[in-house]
Amino acid sequence: MGSKPPRTGIRPCRLPKSQRALLLVDFITTLDFPGGDKLAGPALAAARAAAALKQRLHADGVIAIYANDNYGVWQSDFHSLVSTCLGLEGPAGEIVRVLYPQADDLTILKPRHSAFYASPLELLLTEMETRELVICGLATDMCVQLTAADAFLREYRVWVPSDCTAAESESARAGALDYMARVLKCDVRPSTEPAPGPVSAGG
């Protein structure tokens, strides 16, 4: 009979049920990539708006999920990335301080642009019985749009608050928001307006 594996001290936790979930895409970033300097200012503004929205939604029992790129480093973990970005000066460090993850927030790492692709997100949302997504993050015309597209294909109801996303140019952001509204049927009202009402039991 084999020996028992050593105790890790990690206890499984029961996932909360949350019909609506807040998905924060790629806000935790060094901004150290081509175009990062153009994204920095708008990203910080989007992070501040997303932080205010997160606080309001948390009061309503909405769970926040951070979905962040692993940057191709398969040994990486989310909290190490947070620690790295906290030590940075400028917008990258300020974004992390504004949107610093809380104890009851959930986190996943993603290997590609969409938060759904090759990640545990879909299983996580199923376990939480989530039917509506509020998608905020970077960049509007890349990871946010592709995540919204995958959510649309999976028949989630999606709200992409226009002031809680950022792109390298205003035209890129506006074009992506228009596409998500027209083609992906996303609500793109800003976070300063009342949130969309909950989806009915019949869908």
Where does each model-flagged region fall?
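Active-site-adjacent betaalpha module
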Residues: 1-21, 52-60, 84-203
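A short alpha/beta connector and helix-capping loop motif
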Residues: 18, 36-68
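Generic enzyme active-site microenvironment
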Residues: 24, 67, 161
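A generic "binding-loop/recognition-motif" signal
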Residues: 27, 70, 140
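Short acidic, Gly/Ser-rich segments with clustered Asp/Glu that frequently serve as metal-coordination loops
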Residues: 28-33
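Short acidic, gly/pro-rich beta-turn/loop elements at beta-sheet edges
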Residues: 35, 77, 118
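Short, basic, glycine/proline-bearing loop/turn elements
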Residues: 36-39, 79-82, 133
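Early exported N-terminus immediately downstream of N-terminal targeting peptides
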Residues: 63-64, 68-83
